[in-house]
From Swiss-Prot:
Residues the UniProt record annotates as site (Important for substrate specificity): 160, 214
Organism lineage string: Archaea, Methanobacteriati, Methanobacteriota, Methanomada group, Methanopyri
Organism per entry: Methanopyrus kandleri (strain AV19 / DSM 6324 / JCM 9639 / NBRC 100938)
GO molecular-function terms, A-Z: S-methyl-5-thioadenosine phosphorylase activity
Segment forming the signal sequence: none
Physiological role: Catalyzes the reversible phosphorylation of S-methyl-5'-thioinosine (MTI) to hypoxanthine and 5-methylthioribose-1-phosphate. Involved in the breakdown of S-methyl-5'-thioadenosine (MTA), a major by-product of polyamine biosynthesis. Catabolism of (MTA) occurs via deamination to MTI and phosphorolysis to hypoxanthine.
Official protein name in the record: Probable S-methyl-5'-thioinosine phosphorylase
The protein's assembly and partners: Homotrimer.
Family: Belongs to the PNP/MTAP phosphorylase family. MTAP subfamily.
Catalytic reaction equation(s): S-methyl-5'-thioinosine + phosphate = 5-(methylsulfanyl)-alpha-D-ribose 1-phosphate + hypoxanthine
Binding residues annotated for substrate, in chain numbering: 178, 202-204
Annotated GO biological process: L-methionine salvage from methylthioadenosine; purine ribonucleoside salvage
EC class of the enzyme, as a word: transferase
């Protein structure tokens, strides 16, 4: 039986619910919904909390990822809402698997290693095995899922300016969001595989002439949510029992 963690927003819980558990971590308590997909146990954490009351810059990312570790999770699948920067390749309604990121967050804690020196390698930040499983699941379901994007992480809670988006585009950014970082790095620091399923909900500022509103974001999230949940559920069936990716040896040679 593979134990999988899923981090997402309200309504993204996969599988059949079984029970709820509170996990105590050095960084705070985390409420976890335990579900089952086939023979696999799934631990779901709503990163925004009950009622979506936590903005992106106040989410306790370290507690969330540490809770997954406490539960014995070795694979994490996350969902993230994003805006489209590279309109030549992506558009609202797309589901995208990022392969790299640019970090433009400012104040949130981004590491577990404040007391010792650890330089974890993130040459391939998103687990290749999980991405492959997601692509197999998409093919099985007949869904179009695009891979290869560079995710730009911003602090929030405000949307980005057109000037920022132009700069991100020049730096190679394809999509932009507020919740995908530092989860990806925190997972790597604990040698947990991590992949993100990004839901393109709108064009970023300046890409079109429309004003950004949270209503349009939530509207498209609701449209994409059933497909994303089904994709994750099918992906879980394709995850191999044993890991052969570099994520499981991320700390080898990393500590000074």
């Amino acid at each position: 039986m593979t134990e999988v963690g899923v981090i997402g927003g309200t309504g993204f819980q996969p599988g059949l619910p079984e029970r709820r558990r509170t996990v105590f971590t050095p960084y705070g308590t985390v409420r976890v919904d335990i579900t089952r997909v086939g023979d696999h146990r799934v631990y779901f954490i709503n990163r925004h909390g009950k009622g979506h009351d936590l903005p992106p810059h106040r989410i306790n990312y370290r507690a969330i990822v540490w809770a997954m570790r406490e539960l014995g999770v070795k694979r994490i699948l996350a969902t993230n809402s994003v805006g489209v920067i590279n309109s030549d390749e992506y558009e609202p309604g797309d589901i995208v698997l990022p392969v790299d990121f640019l970090d433009f967050t400012k104040r949130r804690p981004t590491t577990f290693y404040d007391e010792k020196v650890v330089h974890v390698d993130v040459t391939e930040p998103y687990c290749p095995e999980l991405r492959e499983a997601l692509l197999k699941a998409a093919d099985d379901l007949g869904y179009t899922v695009k891979e290869g994007a560079v995710y730009v992480a911003t602090e929030g809670p405000r949307f980005e300016t057109p000037a920022e988006i132009r700069a991100f585009r020049k730096l190679g950014g394809d999509i932009v969001g507020m919740t995908g970082f530092p989860e990806v790095v925190l997972a790597r620091e604990l040698e947990i595989c991590y992949a993100s399923v990004c839901l393109c909900t709108n064009y970023a500022a300046g890409i079109d002439d429309r004003r950004r509103t949270i209503d349009e974001v939530f509207e498209l999230v609701e449209e994409l949510r059933p497909k994303a949940v089904e994709l994750i559920e099918r992906c879980i069936e394709y995850i191999p029992p044993k890991r052969s990716c570099p994520c499981s040896q991320a700390l080898e040679g990393a500590e000074v």
